[in-house]
Amino acid sequence: MKKLLVACCLLSGFASTSVLADAAQDLQSRLAKVNSFHASFSQTVTSSDGAAVQQGEGELWVKRPNLFNWHMTSPDESVLVSDGQTLWFYNPFVEQVTATWLKNATGNTPFMLITRNNANDWKQYNVKQKGNDFELTPKSSSGNLKQFAISVDNSGTIRNFAAVEQDGQRSSYTLKSQQNVAADASKFKFTPPKGVTLDDQRQ
């Protein structure tokens, strides 16, 4: 399920509790300005020593709070879809689909933070702000995420985001051509293709 985490950038700022709270509130309010959007993205994954691990690209559709479709098209195709209840992860290369309840999805993955924009999720982080750049550090060190950063302007448009894992690996995403339009409902529906293995974890 590590690819589920691959979704997610930058900089620091202030330190007082009130400032941290204000930064979190500002980030939430910015993201809340856009309820539905489509964008293409480029991905860069680097190791802890800065060496290039992977370059990729794909498309993203979001309808907050619980609908999204993350389609990685290269170098290997993968699809992550939420229909509002079930989280579907499809890897065509290995012909396998994993299904989990969305309500059980952890709030400590960058992509879930962006799409849900849930107040309870943000409470799990210390948030610092410098202009349009927000840096999030988990209050708990038990998860795989070490740091998450996102750049979002006053209109709610996401420019880029990145996640740094505990081992130092960094996954950076740059969004392009964001269009704040309602996506077709079919983008948020998923039916496992015939012949694939279904790992249903909703039991």
Swiss-Prot record:
Gene Ontology biological process terms in this record: lipoprotein localization to outer membrane; lipoprotein transport
Taxonomic lineage from the root: Bacteria, Pseudomonadati, Pseudomonadota, Gammaproteobacteria, Enterobacterales
Subunit structure: Monomer.
Record-stated family: Belongs to the LolA family.
Naturally occurring in which organism (per UniProt): Serratia proteamaculans (strain 568)
Signal peptide: 1-21
Alphabetized InterPro entries for the sequence: LolA/LolB/LppX (IPR029046), OM_lipoprot_carrier_LolA-like (IPR004564), OM_lipoprot_carrier_LolA_Pbac (IPR018323)
Keyword Ribosomal protein attached: no
Disulfide-linked positions: none
A matching Pfam family: LolA
Protein name: Outer-membrane lipoprotein carrier protein
A single Gene Ontology CC term: outer membrane-bounded periplasmic space
Localization in the cell: Periplasm
Function in brief: Participates in the translocation of lipoproteins from the inner membrane to the outer membrane. Only forms a complex with a lipoprotein if the residue after the N-terminal Cys is not an aspartate (The Asp acts as a targeting signal to indicate that the lipoprotein should stay in the inner membrane).
Top-level taxon: Bacteria
Keywords, comma-separated and alphabetical: Chaperone, Periplasm, Protein transport, Signal, Transport
